[in-house]
């Protein structure tokens, strides 16, 4: 049941909707972990001082 001062959505009214909410939460967690990993790799590649002199035109960013 929705309340007047409620900030989020109301509770699921059916088991299918409840499972859909769990699926959504699980999917967002996976997307967040993948995005964090990619951002960490990009930051590590940009901030490292060990660069290959034969890599031209910022090809290291295309590896990611």
From Swiss-Prot:
Pfam families to which the protein is assigned, alphabetical: COX2_TM
InterPro entries (alphabetical): Cyt_c_oxidase_su2_TM_dom (IPR011759), Cyt_c_oxidase_su2_TM_sf (IPR036257)
GO biological process, one term: electron transport chain
Job description of the protein: Component of the cytochrome c oxidase, the last enzyme in the mitochondrial electron transport chain which drives oxidative phosphorylation. The respiratory chain contains 3 multisubunit complexes succinate dehydrogenase (complex II, CII), ubiquinol-cytochrome c oxidoreductase (cytochrome b-c1 complex, complex III, CIII) and cytochrome c oxidase (complex IV, CIV), that cooperate to transfer electrons derived from NADH and succinate to molecular oxygen, creating an electrochemical gradient over the inner membrane that drives transmembrane transport and the ATP synthase.
Keyword Ribosomal protein recorded: no
Name of this protein: Cytochrome c oxidase subunit 2
Segments on the Mitochondrial matrix side according to the record's topology features: 46-64
Family: Belongs to the cytochrome c oxidase subunit 2 family.
